[in-house]
Design a protein with these regions (language model features):
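Structural signal for interior beta-strand "rungs" in well-ordered beta-sheet cores
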Residues: 2-133
Length: 133
């Protein structure tokens, strides 16, 4: 059974066993989170997001539509994902660029992942990096 802090707004029923979701998180209804994950405080997870098993997402991360995170991934604090390559206020694309974080990857604190890229298996992204290709 998942453990969800009472001060979080978790609307999804797709939360795996032994997953912890801490305070002030928001998880949209169609998000999918695997088993044995740790979703730290102040994390936002949108609808078109898939998170595998044994994933850690540290505080201050927003995971927007179009992001897939495979098993055994570490996402450091305040990592920023983007999902729209040409963002405009009140203009919504037909679909968002897909971003895939492959199994075992580690993304350091305050890194930015520009939409539409894949991070390879067991890759290590240093703190403060900006991934553009």
């Amino acid at each position: 059974m998942a453990r969800i802090h009472p001060l979080s707004a978790v609307m999804s029923q797709n939360i795996g066993n032994e997953t912890n979701i801490w305070q002030f998180c928001v998880v949209f209804p169609q998000a999918r989170i695997g088993d044995n994950c740790n979703i730290c405080a102040n994390v936002l997870i949108e609808n078109d997001v898939i998170i595998g098993n044994n994933v850690t997402v540290k505080s201050g991360v927003q995971i927007w539509d179009g992001v897939e995170i495979e098993d055994n991934v570490f996402i450091g604090p305040n990592v920023t994902f983007t999902n729209d390559l040409v963002p405009r206020s009140k203009v919504y694309p037909q679909s968002f660029a897909r971003t895939i974080i492959k199994k075992g990857a580690s993304i350091g604190a305050n890194s930015t992942i520009i939409a539409g890229h894949s991070i390879g298996e067991y890759a290590f992204i240093g703190a403060g990096s900006v991934i553009t290709k």
